[in-house]
Amino acid sequence: MLDAQTIATVKATIPLLVETGPKLTAHFYDRMFTHNPELKEIFNMSNQRNGDQREALFNAIAAYASNIENLPALLPAVEKIAQKHTSFQIKPEQYNIVGEHLLATLDEMFSPGQEVLDAWGKAYGVLANVFINREAEIYNENASKAGGWEGTRDFRIVAKTPRSALITSFELEPVDGGAVAEYRPGQYLGVWLKPEGFPHQEIRQYSLTRKPDGKGYRIAVKREEGGQVSNWLHNHANVGDVVKLVAPAGDFFMAVADDTPVTLISTGVGQTPMLAMLDTLAKAGHTAQVNWFHAAENGEVHAFADEVKELGQSLPRFTAHTWYRQPSEADRAKGQFDSEGLMDLSKLEGAFSDPTMQFYLCGPVGFMQFTAKQLVDLGVKQENIHYECFGPHKVL
């Protein structure tokens, strides 16, 4: 526990942190990667270049300082970050490196004096221990469950299937022929790659897209413009190639009773965790209402449409609605979408009348903010809305 003086000293730095903003974490990362370049093998350098990770870390530091005397308020954020850390295989000793550079950053940018640095050192130590302990629990859970493993494990690509102009699915089975760990629908795999020509090892998280079967995994990858890893997977990864995987993780998952109605809302590749949820509901014969609401630019980039239709047909109470923002003439001729333009949930207001319905959202942050606001305006309780950000987390 932190003493009152330490808490007061840390909280007194909040105005300075807010005034500085993400410049603080930009300095921190630049310093850390200069002195410890080996960490470039772990961090997603694309998120460093676009600033997303720097903003996310700043928000986390500011939130910690603001809630330093109320750590339980931070536990949901801690769980989300700890789950993600396990896919990077973060180790306790790396927290010492981060702490060293965080304190050096505070000193170099603000010269706050030893009392402030000591207070932040104590505060960081408490938070680091929270993460270290939780991550140790997750590592142990992953290693001890049936089909589980420690560290990375070699998997072979056994199928590669284009699903749209932008999305391709990959089916993976363990090289050792053993069983694989189950997971909760909505969770992701950590994929580790360092093909020839890559300056650093790259680690990405891709949502699992079907119900666990104990034999292998399926992910789906969107080709991102300028995306080093996604383009390599689309252009160069082939059936028979071997990749390294970390056991499934993630705090975004569906866990509902059979009599709980569910609405799955997504756009683009945001449908990937929803597919695992829908597959799970379908194979369990879920008896309550299931809604599938999806938005795409047009039919060319709309993936898994046939699979969703087939899964929906196996559910006793299923409703699907698809929006195309800019449908082609071919899309109109085929009649493969329901509405044109942006997703407007107000036209489906009657679908949300059950107060026990659980809502799962995934897509770009702007889409989820837009959609969550519609749901709240329609009377849905915030606690019934669950969402996943691809990349560093942001609060809706």
UniProtKB/Swiss-Prot annotation:
CC cofactor: heme b; FAD
Domain of life: Bacteria
Residues the record marks as site: Involved in heme-bound ligand stabilization and O-O bond activation: 29
Amino-acid positions noted as binding heme b in the UniProt annotation, renumbered to this chain: 85
Disulfide bonds: none
InterPro entries the record matches: Cbr1-like_FAD-bd_dom, FAD-bd_FR_type, FNR_nucleotide-bd, Globin, Globin-like_sf, Globin/Proto, Hmp, OxRdtase_FAD/NAD-bd
Catalysis: reaction(s): 2 nitric oxide + NADPH + 2 O2 = 2 nitrate + NADP(+) + H(+); 2 nitric oxide + NADH + 2 O2 = 2 nitrate + NAD(+) + H(+)
PANTHER family xrefs: FLAVOHEMOPROTEIN
Free-text domain note: Consists of two distinct domains; an N-terminal heme-containing oxygen-binding domain and a C-terminal reductase domain with binding sites for FAD and NAD(P)H.
Protein name stated in the entry: Flavohemoprotein
